[in-house]
Amino acid sequence: MNTPKNYKVGYKLFEMREDGKLFPLFISKGKETPMNEWLPAENNPTKGYAARPGWHISMTTPDAPHLRGYDGSDLGPYKSRFKNGKRVWCEVLYNTTIDYRDEVSKLPKKCFTDKSPTNGWYLFNEGNRSTWAISDAIKVTRILTEEERQDILRQMNYDEVSAFGPYKKAFEKRKKIA
């Protein structure tokens, strides 16, 4: 795939095997995501997940409080599929050549459900959770160290504890019900 005309920097959480290979967390989780090459999105409907084809990217912060574990860690409620595997934040480039925000804002679900954006991107807001970019192509440029991730969050005055607060309350409420 050729380099898009326009692109931006974002962040994406991956699962990394002990050998350093990256894999998506949920959709197409068995397919390796190589670094330093432009990768087109695929439409792979997956049971239990809403149909929103495309690469999902955090635009500004390497944090996703809705994917954290009950204790607030990046481990989430899932154990690694891989022996000695772990979740890692990566810096990515994502295609922004064509902006589909106006088009998807008129759709019933405010997103494409049958295709990824063609040569572009749009924003998706999932209620009170978060807003992320959905693009037809990404390029993973580097794996962030935890120190680099924390530096980015500090520069943005981003408070992980506050961001996780609503999710922590929801987790605690669910634990009381269970």
What positions do the PLM features span?
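Conserved NAD+-utilizing ADP-ribose enzyme module
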Residues: 1-34, 48-52, 64-178
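Histidine-centered active-site/metal-ligand motif
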Residues: 56
